[in-house]
Amino acid sequence: MSARLKGGLFVRYKQMERKLRLLEIREGYVRKEIETLKREERHSREELDRVKSVPLIMGQFLEPIDSSTAIVGSTAGSNFVVRILSTVDRELLKPNTTVALHRHSSAIVGVLPPEVDSTIPVMGESEKPSVTYGDVGGLDVQKQEIKETVELPLLQSDLYRQIGIDPPQGVLLYGPPGTGKTMLVKAVANHTKATFIRVNGSEFVQKYLGEGPRMVRDVFRLAREKAPSIVFIDEVDSIATKRFDASTSADREVQRVLIELLNQMDGFDPAANVKVIMATNRADTIDPALLRPGRLDRKIEFPLPDRRQKRLVFNAITSKMSLNDSVDIESLVCRPEKISCADINSICQEAGMLAVRASRYMVTQRDFEEAYSKVVERSGTQPAFYN
C-alpha cells in the first residue's frame, strides 16, 4: 500500500475520531438536558399535586372570560374572576358546573362530577320504602288516580302514545295532615323501578342568594340524568305560596325559588320519563301559576276518612296485631269524631303500648277504648280551613 493511501486513511480515521468525541460530548449534554427536564417535570408535578392537595374550595363555574380566566361563584355567595389551571379540560367547564378551587388563589384546579355536590337524597332499589298499596288502608280512588298519573306513563308509555295524548307531568296531593299522602307516595316508590328523589320544600330555602334556585335546577337535572325518575316535593307550600310584593330579601328569595320551579316544570319533555309529585296541607295557599294544567295536571284530594275508609284503615293496621276476641273494631269505626289515618294508627299503637304496660300478649277492647279517648282528646279540633 502506498504511503499516500496510508496517509489518507489516517487523516480520515482522525476526522472520524474527532466526530465521535464530538458526538459523545453532545450526547453528554443531551443526557444532562434530559435529566434537567425530568427534574423540572418532577418538580412541576409535585407543585401541581401541592396545588391540588386538599382541602380545596368548592365553587360553581358561571362563565368563561378567555381560555385562561373565568368567573366562578363561591359558596359564600360572592363571584370571583379566577385563573384556570392549564391541566383542566376546557370541554368540561359548562355553566353551573361544580369546580374545585385553590384555597388561597381560588384558581380552578379541577372539575368535580355532579354527584360530589349532590345533597339530594336519591333512593336506590335497596333503599326504597317497603310500603305497599296493601299497607295503605282505603284510598281506592286516590290509588287509582296516582297510578294513572305516575305509574302507567312510566310502565306503559306506548298506551298514551297510541291514544294520542301526552301523559300527565305532575300531580298535587292535598288534604289535612295525616290522611295518607306521604304513605301513598312511598307505596308508589316501592312499586316502580324508577329512581325516587325526595326533597322537602323547606330545603330549597338556603342562606345565600341564588342557592335555592340552583338546588331546584340540580334536582331536575339529576332527575333527567337518572330517568325514568320520580321527584317528590313534600310540603311544597313552603316555597310555592301565592306571590306578593315582597318586602324582605328572604321573601324575594322564596319567590325566586318558585320562579325557578315553574321554569323547570315548563322545560319538561313529555318523553323524558320524569314525573313530579307534590304534597301539601294547604292547597289554598299555592300559587295559581303552579296549579295550571301543563305543570300539575292532576290534583288529588285526601279528605278525612269516612266510615268505610276508617274500617279499611283499622283492618289494615290491626291485621298485624294480636287482638283479643273482645275487640270490636266496628264500635270504634261508628264513632262520630273526625279522625285522620294517622290518628287511627296512633290509636292502634297506643292500645298496643297499654297491653305492653300490663305485660299482656294480646290487645283488649279496653285498651282500644283508653287509646281512643287519649288520641282524640290530644288531636283536638281541626283548623277551620280543613273543614
Curated annotation (Swiss-Prot):
Keywords: ATP-binding, Cytoplasm, Nucleotide-binding, Nucleus, Proteasome. It holds the Pfam family Prot_ATP_ID_OB_C. It is found in: Cytoplasm; Nucleus. Disulfide bonds: none annotated. The keyword Nucleotide-binding applies. The 26S proteasome consists of a 20S proteasome core and two 19S regulatory subunits. The 20S proteasome core is composed of 28 subunits that are arranged in four stacked rings, resulting in a barrel-shaped structure. The two end rings are each formed by seven alpha subunits, and the two central rings are each formed by seven beta subunits. The catalytic chamber with the active sites is on the inside of the barrel. Belongs to the AAA ATPase family. This is 26S proteasome regulatory subunit 6B homolog.
